[in-house]
C-alpha cells in the first residue's frame, strides 16, 4: 500500500527526514502519526524508527545543528529538536524483559518492533522515501478501516507489559473504536490488576487525552 503523506506533514518535520534519508533507505514514521494520517488527520507528534546506529544518529544530527537529548540511549531512543519541533527517533527494537512499565530492549527487526507495540493500528510503519505502508501484524490497515481496536499478540501479555494500555484502550473506545472480543475480555478480566498497577500521573495523561485537553 502506497500512501501520499507529505502534504499532511508540518514543515518542521522535513529537516529530520532529510538527515535520516541521507543515511539510509530504512526510515519510517510509526505509531500515532501514521494512524492519524491514514484517518485523514494532521498529527502533531512524530516518531521515527530506523536502522542507523545511535552513535551515528547523534553525530549527524549534532553536526547539523539539531539538539539531541541522549537520556534514552540505553533504550535505543533519542529526542531530537530543531527550531520548535521535537521528534523521537529510535532503532528497531525487541523487548528482552518488561516489568509492567519499563522494558529492557535490544536491537531488532521491523517485525520485532511491531510486535512490541500495543495495538495493531499503532503498529503501522510508513517508509518516508517510498510512501509504502508496512503492516507487520497483518491486521493494522484492516482494523483501522473498520475502527477495530486489537491488541498485538496476546492481549493479557500486552497489558502486563504496560498497564497503561488498559486505560489507552478506553481512550480509543471513546474515539469510536470497538475493542475486538479477545481484547475486550482481557481488559474486563484484568481491570483490577490494571487499576492497581497504574500510577496517577500516567492515568491523568490518558484521561486528559480522552477529554481532548
Protein language model regions, located:
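Catalytic cores of the polymerase beta-like nucleotidyltransferase superfamily
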Residues: 1-213
Amino acid at each position: 500500500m502506497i500512501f501520499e503523506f507529505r502534504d499532511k506533514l508540518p514543515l518542521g518535520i522535513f529537516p529530520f527526514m532529510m538527515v535520516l534519508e541521507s543515511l539510509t533507505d530504512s526510515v519510517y514514521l510509526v505509531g500515532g502519526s501514521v494512524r492519524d494520517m491514514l484517518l485523514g488527520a494532521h498529527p502533531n507528534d512524530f516518531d521515527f524508527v530506523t536502522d542507523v546506529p545511535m552513535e551515528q544518529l547523534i553525530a549527524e544530527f549534532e553536526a547539523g545543528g539539531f539538539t539531541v537529548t541522549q537520556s534514552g540511549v540505553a533504550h535505543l531512543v533519542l529526542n531530537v529538536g530543531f527550531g520548535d519541533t521535537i521528534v523521537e527517533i529510535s532503532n528497531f527494537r525487541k523487548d528482552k524483559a518488561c516489568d509492567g512499565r519499563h522494558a529492557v530492549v535490544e536491537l531488532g527487526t521491523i517485525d520485532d518492533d511491531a510486535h512490541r507495540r500495543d495495538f495493531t493500528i499503532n503498529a503501522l510503519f510508513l517508509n518516508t522515501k517510498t510512501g509504502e505502508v508496512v503492516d507487520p501484524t497483518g491486521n493494522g490497515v484492516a482494523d483501522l478501516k473498520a475502527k477495530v481496536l486489537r491488541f498485538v499478540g496476546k492481549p493479557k501479555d500486552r497489558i502486563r507489559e504496560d498497564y497503561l494500555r488498559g486505560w489507552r484502550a478506553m481512550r480509543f473506545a471513546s474515539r469510536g473504536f470497538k475493542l475486538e472480543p479477545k481484547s475486550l475480555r482481557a481488559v474486563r478480566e484484568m481491570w483490577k490488576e490494571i487499576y492497581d498497577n497504574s500510577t496517577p500521573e500516567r492515568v491523568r495523561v490518558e484521561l486528559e487525552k480522552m477529554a481532548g485537553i
